[in-house]
Amino acid sequence: MSENNNDKITVKKTLTLKRSVLETSTVKQNFSHGRTKAVVVETKRRKITRTDEKAETSQPITKPHVAPQRSKPRFEEAKPSESSMAKSNLSSAEMEARLRALEEAHIQERITREKVEEQARRIKEREESLRQAVQETEIHQEEQKEEKNPPVQTSPLSSAHSSIEPIDIAITPKNITVTEKRKADEIKNDDRHSRRANPAKSEVRTPKVVKGANERRRGKLTLNSALDEEGSVRGRSMAAMRRRQEKFKRAQNQEPKEKISREVVIPETITIQELAQRMAERSVDVIKFLMKQEQMMKPGDVIDADVAELIAVEFGHTVKRVLESDVEEGIFNIADNPQKMQPRPPVVTIMGHVDHGKTSLLDAIRKANVVSGEAGGITQHIGAYQVEQNGQKITFIDTPGHAAFTAMRARGARVTDIAVLVVAADDSVMPQTVESINHAKAAGVPIIVAINKIDKPAADAQKVRTELLQHEVFVETMGGETLEVEVSAKTGQNLVKLLEAILLQAELLDLKADPKRTAEGVVIEAKLDRGRGSVATVLVQKGTLHPSDIIVAGNEWGRVRALIDDHGRHVKEAVPSTPIEILGMQGTPQAGDRFAVVTHEAKAREIAEYRQRLARDKAVARQTGSRSSLEQMMTKLQTTGIKEFPLIVKGDVQGSIEAIASALEKLGNEEVRARIVHSGAGGITESDISLAEASNSAVIGFNVRANKQACALAKTQGIEIRYYNIIYDLVDDIKAAMSGLLSPEQRETFLGNAEILEVFNITKIGKVAGCRVIEGKIERGAGVRLIRDNIVIHEGKLKTLKRFKDEVNEVQSGQECGIAFENYEDIRAGDTIEIFRIEHINRTL
């Protein structure tokens, strides 16, 4: 029996660790610094032995499948049973040495794998592929080594006594936790001491690691890996990568959009955001462009038209510059068609002194009593009426006669065709009569003199004609061209003759207008009526005005609701030279404002807003004194090219005024002269200030002062009043102001000549002529002429004047020097340089 048993024992197979009894699963762990480790969890099954093997086997230790937990798993060593220890005759020291060898091999393999992964991470483009390739290469090399080196076999002596069972150890190179690392380090240290004591002892090789089925799903995201990878960063999914590739392909295949060039309308000022919207660009792009130009701005900042044009051109757009005043283009001064012109009635203005019978004369002409309705017999507003004589119509405008309404009288003179100057035969020429003459002459309209109150016993028509000669009004009976008619508003004497004289003068003027075009005219007066609202009396000068027309008058606009004539009747249209009342204005315009018909309300509103804004700016300018000095007025006249110096002179007596006027007339020459717009004896009144504002004149007071109302009006209008009590001081100041209008005189002074001896080229300076002064002297900064063969080829200024390498101010005759010209280098030896100086001398009268 013993022999048979021994025979069976001798033929047993070599001791091996069979891997077929293990079911493996892989769990990936992440550590700091980008390191990862795959841990294999193995489940041991029952080992099945062959029937011919009578050796007693120990029950296999089954380790349950360990699911990945967030807590660190505990490491349990698989210890052999006492029976197997007794049968294998292995001491505990040998078993511990074998375990330590296995752990050391595992740790060494992990260290090697980490080094390989560290090297693979440094390669950016193929990080993951290279790391997997290195791992596969290492595993393949280990398999080849195991094929060459078979597993360690037990000695024949130990196998003869007992059969050794395979030891199933649930430890693999990939299931070591942090606790296992500490134990492995302790085992490694103990093994080093044991190796020193037993250097001849053979080492046990690490069993080969076999890739399980789960290794193929290493890069997949599973529930176990998601629970185990705490704190790890999840990578991009395949769907995200696929979307990214599709987006990149679309961007590659998409054709670039063609730049669209637009016409950008740029006003005087515009915000960056509005400019970007008009260019169809982003505000950020415009701000980036400004940042490149070293301008830090925001979308809401306002820039001027020049900067806006630069930005628009830089972005590839065309620019159309517009001004705020462009909104008024196309409403005034439209050219009339000569073929459509038709005769129109003349517009006649009744002018004259207060209480000389202007309204009474007009009332006699109209055959209607309007005098009784006036306060104190004085006309308080401009009345416009139309009468008919021999089938021809005449439009009359009655202006107030007293001095407080000088500005209204000036507006009336601007709209009239013929001025009828009413002078009382018993009162002769008065101050307001002279003002009316001046207004008529300034407007350039012909004058017809109506000598009224001829029926009175004290009437002296010849005296009136003689006094009119002093104001340059020459009537026909005195050898002039001005028509005069002796009339009586009370008795109606010669009224028909006056109307015939007006029609005769109108025939000479050949007055025509186009009634088919849009209406245009002037506001005669405006008022606010409690029942009807704003009511404006206008004079149609061109075209025909209809109800429902949209008009702009000064700073106001409105739609015509009704047209009322001078008899209070509603009419359907107003032809040229027709005075008419209009209802429907949004506000009350000023007397003298021009009106015109526009196409739609938006344009009318835009024009009115622009004019209101302009009026506010002018009011601010007056308060700051923009026109408050005589010097600024002189500068304005000089820039506009006007050579006349307008003045309004008021004195204490008529003799002083005549002396001042005579002295001022002597100051003029062929370039500039003084023009006295108005002069008179007495204090400075509101009428004088209004006339100065209308004619842009200076106000001079000689031994007189302005009253309180005139001072307030002058301050409001920004008119300066100068007072004098010595006639010579007055003349000297006016002379100095008028002298400023004269252009200065240029006088040339010869300094010397120099001859060019040699020409030198000097760095950073250019050509320098070495000269000798042969006549006079050379001064620094003087003018020079280059003469070659007695021909002047260049005239300019000196750039450099040196003597012995030093800058000098002048060089005397007989000395040598170096000369360089400004922006000119065509100089040759033998040329002659002429030096001169130009002096500007102010001219005086």
From Swiss-Prot:
GO terms for molecular function: GTP binding; GTPase activity; guanosine tetraphosphate binding; translation initiation factor activity. Signal peptide: none annotated. It comes from the Bacteria. Residues 45-91, 127-209 are annotated as: Disordered. Residues 81-91, 151-162 have a biased composition (Polar residues). Pfam families: EF-G_D2 (PF22042), GTP_EFTU (PF00009), GTP_EFTU_D2 (PF03144), IF-2 (PF11987), IF2_assoc (PF08364), IF2_N (PF04760). InterPro entries: EF-G-like_DII (IPR053905), EFTu-like_2 (IPR004161), IF2_assoc_dom_bac (IPR013575), IF2_II (IPR044145), IF2_N (IPR006847), P-loop_NTPase (IPR027417), Small_GTP-bd (IPR005225), T_Tr_GTP-bd_dom (IPR000795). NCBIfam families: IF-2, small_GTP. Belongs to the TRAFAC class translation factor GTPase superfamily. Classic translation factor GTPase family. IF-2 subfamily. This is Translation initiation factor IF-2. It comes from Bartonella quintana (strain Toulouse).
